[in-house]
Each structure stands twice: as structure tokens, then as C-alpha cells.
């Protein structure tokens, strides 16, 4: 067994099990540096085990479908139902069988600083990705619920021509009128890795669009609020009025439209 603290730290880096004999051997070493390194490595392993357990639980729907013979399971989710401006964006993602991506979760639970990293990991591992975008004008015409369905259907359509085609759909709290076997899962983005993958793809795609709109329409803080009705956004509306990407069927934009048409 190594004796210097530096050598012990290097040995601990290779340990992946809490039952490794090295932990028991080092438990009697009274040096504070050794005990600190020991506890630090145990904490890392515990976190990795917890993450593995979480990811395994989020594969429960997929594993049940694999047992039934399905091979290409697509997760579908959307982002952007609630904002006052911008499109609703849906994504359809097919991951390889039993694929696990560390940190993948409901996009709302992923720290913003990690969005891009996990998004890139999904893009690298996914067998197929489709994205559907429905703009604010169509949202106003058909309502946000129907627009969400259209975005999801468009995301599925975008898979046409790709090597892998879905034989089953796992959808976040929605049922689609399409001839593919499917299951609607409440809070699916937190309970299915396939849906979570779609969630982060849709989220990053929409955030990039809103950051671009922020450059086109400064003063509304779109890059930070993604079109949601924050204090800065509402101040922008009051100061500069409605932009071409605002949803005129959403309040307070709707009332502002009415006010502008009344003398």
C-alpha cells in the first residue's frame, strides 16, 4: 500500500467500490490528509452510485418496452408553452438501447451551466433527432395546446429519411394522432431518459433562438427570460411595445393589442 499522501490520493482515484479493501486499510491512518482524501473519494463514489441508480430508474419505461420487442423508442417533449413571446419547440429523440447519459434529467432540473454539455452528449449518442418549431402566429391561430401537438408531430416528421425510425413513442403528458404505438407519461421528462433527452434538445434549441431574438429585439431581455413574463420583459413591453414574435393571444400582450386598436 502506498504511504505518501500523494500516492494514496492517486490510488484512491482508481477505486470505484465502497467495499474496496483500501478504504478499510486507510481507516486506521491518523493523518488528516489521508482521512480527508478517504472521505472525499467515498463521497464521489456515493454520488456516482446514486446517479447510476437514478438513471436506471429513468430507464424503467424503456426497459419494459425493450422486453416487449420494441427497438427504437423515441422520447418526445416540448419547451415554451408559457412564454409571452417566441415559438413552442418540440424534440423527438431516439437513444441507443439502455443508453445512460450522466446528468440527463428534466431540463428544468439541470443547472443552466450544464445545458450545453448535456445537449452535446445527447447529440453525440442519439440515433436520431427531430425538432419541430411552431411560431407565435400559429400559436395565436390554433391555441398553445394544439400548437404543442403540431410541434411534436413536426419533430417526428423530421425523423423521416434518417436511418432509425421510431416504433414506439414516449410522450410527455400528451397523446398524438399518429399511427405509431405510444404512451403518455405525466412528468415524463423526469421519469424517462428518452423524454429527458428530448427535453434538453428542445430547451437548448429554443434558448438559442431566443438569444438570437434578443439581438434583433433588444430591451426585452429575451436572452435571459426566454420570452417568459419577467419584470424586465414586462418593462420592455411597456417601454417599446409589442414585437413581431409576441403572442397576441397571451395576456398582457392581448390587452395591449386591444388598447392599441381602440382610440
From Swiss-Prot:
GO cellular component: cytoplasm; ribonuclease H2 complex
Enzymatic reactions: Endonucleolytic cleavage to 5'-phosphomonoester
Residue positions binding a divalent metal cation: 77-78, 172
GO MF terms held by the record: manganese ion binding; RNA binding; RNA-DNA hybrid ribonuclease activity
Manner of cofactor binding, per the entry note: Manganese or magnesium. Binds 1 divalent metal ion per monomer in the absence of substrate. May bind a second metal ion after substrate binding.
Secretion signal, residue range per the UniProt entry: none
Enzyme Commission number, as recorded: 3.1.26.4
PROSITE patterns: RNASE_H_2
Coiled coil: none
Domain RNase H type-2, residue spans: 71-262
CDD domains per record: RNase_HII_bacteria_HII_like
One Pfam entry name: RNase_HII
Main EC class the enzyme belongs to: hydrolase
UniProt KW keywords: Cytoplasm, Endonuclease, Hydrolase, Manganese, Metal-binding, Nuclease
Cofactors (names): Mn(2+); Mg(2+)
GO biological process: DNA replication, removal of RNA primer; mismatch repair
Chief place where the protein resides: cytoplasm
Locations listed in the record: Cytoplasm
Database matches in InterPro entries: RNase_HII, RNase_HII/HIII, RNase_HII/HIII_dom, RNaseH-like_sf, RNaseH_sf
Keyword Metal-binding: yes
Family: Belongs to the RNase HII family.
Function: Endonuclease that specifically degrades the RNA of RNA-DNA hybrids.
NCBIfam families, alphabetized: PRK00015.1-1 (NF000594), PRK00015.1-3 (NF000595)
Protein name: Ribonuclease HII
The gene coding this protein: rnhB
Amino acid at each position: 500500500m502506498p504511504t505518501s499522501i500523494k500516492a494514496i490520493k492517486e490510488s484512491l482515484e482508481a477505486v470505484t467500490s465502497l467495499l474496496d479493501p483500501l478504504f478499510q486499510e486507510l481507516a486506521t491512518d491518523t493523518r488528516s490528509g489521508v482521512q480527508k482524501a478517504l472521505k472525499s473519494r467515498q463521497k464521489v463514489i456515493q454520488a456516482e452510485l446514486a446517479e447510476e441508480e437514478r438513471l436506471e430508474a429513468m430507464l424503467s419505461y424503456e426497459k419494459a418496452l425493450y422486453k416487449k420487442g420494441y427497438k427504437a423508442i423515441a422520447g418526445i417533449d416540448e419547451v415554451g408553452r408559457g412564454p409571452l413571446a417566441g415559438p413552442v419547440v418540440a424534440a423527438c429523440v431516439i437513444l441507443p438501447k439502455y443508453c445512460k447519459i450522466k446528468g440527463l434529467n428534466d431540463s428544468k432540473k439541470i443547472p443552466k451551466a450544464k445545458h450545453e454539455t448535456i445537449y452535446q452528449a445527447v447529440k453525440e449518442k442519439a440515433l436520431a433527432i427531430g425538432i419541430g418549431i411552431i411560431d407565435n402566429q400559429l400559436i395565436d391561430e390554433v391555441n398553445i395546446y394544439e400548437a404543442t401537438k403540431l410541434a411534436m408531430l413536426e419533430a417526428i416528421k423530421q425523423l423521416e429519411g434518417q436511418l432509425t425510425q421510431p416504433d414506439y413513442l414516449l410522450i410527455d403528458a400528451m397523446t398524438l394522432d399518429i399511427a405509431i404505438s405510444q404512451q403518455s407519461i405525466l412528468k415524463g421528462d423526469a421519469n424517462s431518459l428518452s423524454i429527458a433527452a428530448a427535453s434538453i434538445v428542445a430547451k437548448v434549441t429554443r434558448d438559442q433562438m431566443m438569444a438570437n431574438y434578443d439581438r434583433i429585439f433588444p430591451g426585452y431581455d429575451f436572452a435571459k427570460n426566454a420570452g417568459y413574463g419577467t419584470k424586465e420583459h414586462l418593462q420592455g413591453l411597456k417601454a417599446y411595445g409589442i414585437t413581431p414574435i409576441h403572442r397576441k393571444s397571451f395576456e398582457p400582450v392581448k390587452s395591449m393589442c386591444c388598447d392599441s386598436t381602440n382610440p
